[in-house]
Amino acid sequence: MRILVTNDDGIQSKGIIVLAELLSEEHEVFVVAPDKERSATGHSITIHVPLWMKKVFISERVVAYSTTGTPADCVKLAYNVIMDKRVDLIVSGVNRGPNMGMDILYSGTVSGAMEGAMMNIPSIAISSANYESPDFEGAARFLIDFLKEFDFSLLDPFTMLNINVPAGEIKGWRFTRQSRRRWNDYFEERVSPFGEKYYWMMGEVIEDDDRDDVDYKAVREGYVSITPIHPFLTNETCLKKLREVYD
């Protein structure tokens, strides 16, 4: 397959290098990734300013470029400029830390894959769910095995897979729902060396979803969480109720 690999941790991150090198053992791999950390940039794109791109070296088997853009920019550039619109699969990752619950709305990793889904290209976001001790190789090897088994024709149009891999021994995988996992944010007030006040965002994770088949519960129990998601955000249940009342 011709595989495009991107991420939001940057071209220099271990996660993308390990993933690209392992995938290139069996596939034609192109890497287009941000030239610096772009975590939590969501699905932003670059407009009104130039996008710069530079060829970089990862390995002999991998064609790689860094860009000044976001993960979504990287996918657009790769598809339209570098790969001549011939892409069989897009993989975004391996991310350092989980992308579960409401994280996916902020995640540049997920947005890189979602950009592919919006083009109706098979796309996967993959994260090592332990931020402190990420197992990039374990996540990458899981993905390689998964690709040999999974039938992408089972996915609806414009749908991607969001995969979170637990650290340590993997018991198997589960197809899961996006959870209601979210953050309670607060801001720590600090003072710069120049005496200027600034704020540092902090947060505590809230995991109180009462459903059993959600992403973080699978990961907590040692299973890889695989969640099919799409870019269409309409709340169909609420829409039906509103129409019944007001139409």
UniProtKB/Swiss-Prot annotation:
GO terms for molecular function: 3'-nucleotidase activity; 5'-nucleotidase activity; exopolyphosphatase activity; metal ion binding; nucleotide binding. Its EC number is 3.1.3.5. Its cofactor is a divalent metal cation. Belongs to the SurE nucleotidase family. The keyword Transmembrane helix does not apply. One of its GO terms (cellular component) is cytoplasm. Nucleotidase that shows phosphatase activity on nucleoside 5'-monophosphates. SUPFAM superfamilies: SurE-like. Binds 1 divalent metal cation per subunit. A divalent metal cation binds at residues 8-9, 39, 95. Keywords: Cytoplasm, Hydrolase, Metal-binding, Nucleotide-binding. InterPro entries: SurE, SurE-like_Pase/nucleotidase, SurE-like_sf. This is 5'-nucleotidase SurE. Pfam families: SurE. The keyword Cytoplasm applies. It is found in: Cytoplasm. It catalyses: a ribonucleoside 5'-phosphate + H2O = a ribonucleoside + phosphate. Its main location: cytoplasm. HAMAP family: SurE. NCBIfam families: PRK00346.1-4 (NF001490), PRK00346.2-2 (NF001492), PRK13935.1 (NF010545), surE (TIGR00087).
